[in-house]
Amino acid sequence: MRTILALILLGTTAALAAELPAIPNAPIAKKKELLFSDDFEAATPAKQWHKVVPTFAFEKGMLKGTQTRDQNIPAAEGKPAVTAHAAVHGLEIPTKDSVVEVRIRLDGATFASVEFDDRKYTGAHYGHICLAQVRTNGVTIIDQRDGNMRNDIYEMSKDPAKKAERAQLLKGRQITYPAKVESGVWHTLVVETVGDAMRVTLDGKPAAYLKSSGIGHATKSKIELGVGGKDGYFDDIKVWNAEPAAP
């Protein structure tokens, strides 16, 4: 019975993978000037780093993320409610088209992510623009600006009666490709963003691709690294300005 179930799951996964759009084999971005790099070996963190959501620590030449806001706590005794949220650390590096390369390691964490935000943009919750997320079983790209974080769609997530309508609005705004990402092992993540397209590679292999309008947001004012669960690590981050690669 277990063998039959395994074969069914394998067949289902293969069928889903076959329906996904092809990922470009070649880079979609051409690197230009290097905007930022950090190997986390300095005694003092670079000034561009800042706290967003606890908890991150510079530890043994790495950036360690641990989700400590891991449960919803209702308001009580004059204290505001606390909503569970991934740990997030921000990098003040303005970009439009870019290549972000960073080594990641999931040591129990459910995911690690690279996100682009524009806090001055008011059309999406907290100025979220787009996101690349790596889990042990898949790589996801999300157009947040025109997808799940767009103000009206974000509000719909709080109303079960709007579930079907929200699902329709989210079509084409995010995609997940299956992957096998080993925990406790370093992986090289590269996120290319050019125009309204994002391409992700993992350990040099194409891992995900999405073309969606929100990705083309012209003023991505910051990059944020995220970790869900406990613990995730980042190292050797580099950020380049970029332009479309030659066809």
Which ranges hold each PLM region?
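Beta-strand-rich interaction surfaces with strong enrichment in secreted/lumenal proteins
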Residues: 25-26, 86-92, 175-181, 224
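Extracellular beta-strand elements of beta-rich domains used
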Residues: 40, 237-239
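Secretory/extracellular carbohydrate-interaction modules
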Residues: 70-159
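Short, solvent-exposed beta-strand-to-loop segments that form ligand-recognition rims
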Residues: 203-222
